[in-house]
């Protein structure tokens, strides 16, 4: 039979373990991948390989559909033949300007620009797809693929997918020699792009939620996307990190609660060890 001391200690450890398990389970449930698209990449006359990307069509349906349709070219325009015009090592690779090729052009399937859909997902790992912009609600066709965690972009750029296969090709692009304006010295082109078979139901991405509440949020039908015909700003770009930017990962409340449980367990253990023998009465030891 457990003594009271052992029972209290076991209960404390059990609560801590359950909290840790709950956090891990929540983190493991990522956004659903609804579509797969690909880019066949060339540099000069040399094939670099294929990048296969999964899109989060349940979480950001408008943004994912924009990228999917531009990858297939079904609207009469799209990514095929365009270049990666901006490459910054240990940050990201940027492309999608199929009208001017220098970061000042591009357009969405909804019109010139469309609003930020939501910021439910964080830039929590390398290999994530996110929209390049020139400020709030200025999404067009330009996108970037992260090559490191870029938490300072959370809440400013819309994450909508991830690299499923061919991250080695992303690394080849990232490590290419660049010149002025971070443009590759030798152009890197999307020679071919298109859509692949829809992945099995239940396939989940690896991007983390900005809030755990989003993981179980019921998906609602997408509202019509407002179209803006204003002239595009000078550049769709992505800001570099600043010293004040930080990403703590798990929600603060969960961290405090977990720490509190551990401290409580330690305090109980110390007090019970110091208690005089027989404190709990006969039959309890």
Curated annotation (Swiss-Prot):
| Domain PPIase cyclophilin-type intervals | 38-195
Which residues get glycosylated? 139
Q: Where are the transmembrane segments?
A: 250-270
Matching InterPro entries: Cyclophilin-like_dom_sf, Cyclophilin-type_PPIase_CS, Cyclophilin-type_PPIase_dom
Q: Give the residue ranges for region: Disordered.
A: 217-243
- Superkingdom in the source lineage: Eukaryota
| Annotated SUPFAM superfamilies | Cyclophilin-like
As for family, the record states: Belongs to the cyclophilin-type PPIase family. PPIase B subfamily.
What's the protein here called?
Answer: Peptidyl-prolyl cis-trans isomerase B
List the source organism: Neurospora crassa (strain ATCC 24698 / 74-OR23-1A / CBS 708.71 / DSM 1257 / FGSC 987)
């Amino acid at each position: 039979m457990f003594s009271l001391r052992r029972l209290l200690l076991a209960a404390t450890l059990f609560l801590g373990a359950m909290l840790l398990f709950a956090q891990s389970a929540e983190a493991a449930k990522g956004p659903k991948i609804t579509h797969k698209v690909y880019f066949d990449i060339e540099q000069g006359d040399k094939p670099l390989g294929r990048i296969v990307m999964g899109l989060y069509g349940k979480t950001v349906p408008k943004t994912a559909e924009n990228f999917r349709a531009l990858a297939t070219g079904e609207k009469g325009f799209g990514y095929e033949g365009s270049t990666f015009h901006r490459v910054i090592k240990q940050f990201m690779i940027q492309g999608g300007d199929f009208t001017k090729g220098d970061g000042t052009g591009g357009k969405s399937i909804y019109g010139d620009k469309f609003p930020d859909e939501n910021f439910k997902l964080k830039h929590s790992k390398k290999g994530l797809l996110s929209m390049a912009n020139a400020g709030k609600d200025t999404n067009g066709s330009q996108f970037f693929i992260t090559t490191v965690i870029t938490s300072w972009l959370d809440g400013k750029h819309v994450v909508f997918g991830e690299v499923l296969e061919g991250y080695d090709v992303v690394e080849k692009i990232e490590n290419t020699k660049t010149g002025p304006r971070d443009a590759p010295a030798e152009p890197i082109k999307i020679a071919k792009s298109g859509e692949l078979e829809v992945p099995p139901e239940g396939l989940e991405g690896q991007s983390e939620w900005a809030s755990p509440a989003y993981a179980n949020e019921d998906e609602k039908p997408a509202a019509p996307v407002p179209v803006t015909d204003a002239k595009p700003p000078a550049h769709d770009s992505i800001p570099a990190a600043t010293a004040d930017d930080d990403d703590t990962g798990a929600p603060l409340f969960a961290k405090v609660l977990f720490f509190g449980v551990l401290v409580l367990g330690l305090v109980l253990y110390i007090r019970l060890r110091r208690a005089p023998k027989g404190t709990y009465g006969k039959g309890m030891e």
